[in-house]
Amino acid sequence: MHTIPELASPKSWQSTLPSRRAEICQAILEGLPRGFEFAKPFLSTELAEVGGTAWEVPCFYDAQHETTLTLVLGDDFTYGATAQRLDKLRDSIPAEDWSLIAPVVHAAQEAGPVHVPAFLMGRFPTFEWVIEEHVELCEGLERPDFSSEDGPFPAYVTQEEAQRFLAATGYRLPWDHEWEYVAKAGMERLYVCGDAVPQRDLSGDVCLTQFGDGQLNRAAANPWGMVALAVATFTRLQASPHEWRIRGGAAAFYPFQHRMQQAMLLTELQLPLANMPGQMAGLRLCLDVPAI
């Protein structure tokens, strides 16, 4: 586990001198496995929009596995939905939809905020070709269809396929609290991409199939630069690391939601594996920040 105070929160990072930031990023790069290099930083404009200063989110590229990782700075956040938040959700969602969603909304258990240490997370869901270069996917499984023939596509894999891939590459799954923290972008946001109900039907592109499209990426990214958190992913529970969940919303309810089911974009959805056909989900690759 790293002990770098500058990574404890976005505020700490922004108050750090540029020379020290560069020193920390260089030390992280040197602590990562061979084959990593610096990637173009993501410019977060969230603070600039509320009168602050835009800041660069450091990114690292794993050439061997063709994966870009973002340095997710630590911070405190409310893990799960508070009682007040549940009341707000209940009042904002049609009763029929709420009755279906309520059993899988993750309610807050902690008395206070949970601290998430900094870690590295893939900017995109893991693509099919990356998985297939390392493990053989089981044939005969019906995997989610996508609305466009243009790729690349995020891979939907079984738990067993995911375990084999992680063992082969040295990556890990996000802990469940890490995923929810990034989905909320360090704030109390209602939806995984933004803070308002989308004003159009997302059924055609909820999985954001054209990740190579820069405009789509910018539209889908949260303030950390994370793209397409709506794609369902496996997570692990800290209290029981052998227990997996599926997080993300939207695509977690396969087939994809229609216009009247926007509530499925809720950040706090925490689904048992049985909720996905074939117990399949996507992968968001993570690494711990190296000790410096």
Feature-to-residue mapping (PLM):
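Functional-site microenvironments in short loops/helix caps that host divalent-cation chemistry
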Residues: 72, 148-149, 155-269, 279
